């Protein structure tokens, strides 16, 4: 898709949107569809992911998702996630936001709260301290939490992994995935100004339409598409 040549979009500062939820909720697909829709409207968009997103963070991603870091224990894993996030924020996310870009990120700080905090049984104060250091003031303007029964999401993830090796999180038991679903919903309930919950148990096109609608309503007024100078004076 291409931007309408009669539309110019300018953001005084960037807008940071994170995509959260359990395994198999379709986050990555929805992030791609939103990026395409916003780009077609003339916005500058960057898509990224965690763990990873920068050169340093991608190196850590392999260690974390392969299971190679499991022997270190959950506390050390949380530190590795935080180190990857810090590099990602400073090398990719913050510079893009400073240039007026809409940044879409597949997982961010809420995943650490859920995966390392709730189901990793780390004390909240430790998780919060790591988060504060890692994000260094870069907080999402909007977090979209894709909600799906854990059994459905896990089955989707396993089908997706049929032609690939499932990562260590996809191998975990249903009970663990159910706890994570509830934890994400708890985060949304505690921070309704930032978080929006979207029913992910629907066709992708229906979900994408809802996501685009809610994001367009949240974008700052100075970033709304306006007629170009040529159109305004015609």
Swiss-Prot record:
Q: Which Gene3D superfamilies match?
A: P-loop containing nucleotide triphosphate hydrolases
The GO molecular function terms of this record are:
ATP binding; dTMP kinase activity
Q: Name one Pfam family in it.
A: Thymidylate_kin
Give a GO cellular-component term: cytosol
- PROSITE patterns associated with the record: THYMIDYLATE_KINASE
Q: Which InterPro entries match?
A: P-loop_NTPase (IPR027417), Thymidylate_kin-like_dom (IPR039430), Thymidylate_kin_CS (IPR018095), Thymidylate_kinase (IPR018094)
For the biological process aspect of GO, one term held by this record is: dUDP biosynthetic process
Q: Where does ATP bind?
A: 21-28
| Sorted UniProt keywords | ATP-binding, Kinase, Nucleotide biosynthesis, Nucleotide-binding, Transferase
Q: Catalysed reaction(s)? A: dTMP + ATP = dTDP + ADP
The EC category is transferase
User: Which Enzyme Commission numbers does its entry carry?
Assistant: 2.7.4.9
Record-stated family: Belongs to the thymidylate kinase family.
Q: What does this protein do?
A: Phosphorylation of dTMP to form dTDP in both de novo and salvage pathways of dTTP synthesis.
What is the designated name of this protein?
A: Thymidylate kinase
Biological source species: Rhizobium meliloti (strain 1021) (Ensifer meliloti)
Encoding gene, per UniProt annotation: tmk
């Amino acid at each position: 898709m291409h931007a309408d040549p009669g539309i110019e979009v300018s953001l005084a500062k960037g807008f940071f949107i994170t995509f959260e939820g359990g395994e198999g909720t379709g986050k990555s697909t929805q992030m791609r569809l939103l990026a395409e829709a916003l780009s077609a409207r003339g916005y500058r968009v960057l898509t990224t992911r965690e763990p990873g997103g920068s050169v340093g963070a991608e190196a850590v991603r392999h260690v974390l998702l392969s299971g190679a870091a499991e022997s270190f224990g959950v506390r050390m894993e949380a530190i590795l996630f935080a180190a990857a996030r810090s590099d990602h924020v400073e090398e990719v996310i913050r510079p893009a936001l400073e240039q007026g870009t809409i940044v879409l990120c597949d997982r961010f700080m809420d995943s650490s709260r859920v995966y390392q905090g709730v189901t990793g049984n780390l004390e909240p104060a430790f998780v919060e301290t790591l988060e504060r250091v890692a994000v260094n003031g870069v907080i999402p303007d909007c977090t979209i939490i894709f909600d799906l029964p854990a059994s459905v999401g896990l089955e989707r993830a396993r089908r997706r992994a049929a032609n690939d090796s499932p990562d260590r999180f996809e191998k975990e038991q249903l009970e663990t995935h159910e706890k994570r679903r509830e934890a994400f919903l708890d985060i949304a309930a505690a921070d309704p100004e930032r978080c929006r919950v979207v029913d992910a148990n629907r066709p992708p096109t229906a979900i994408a339409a809802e996501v685009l609608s809610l994001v367009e309503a949240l974008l700052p007024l100075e970033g709304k598409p306006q007629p170009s100078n040529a159109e305004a004076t015609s």
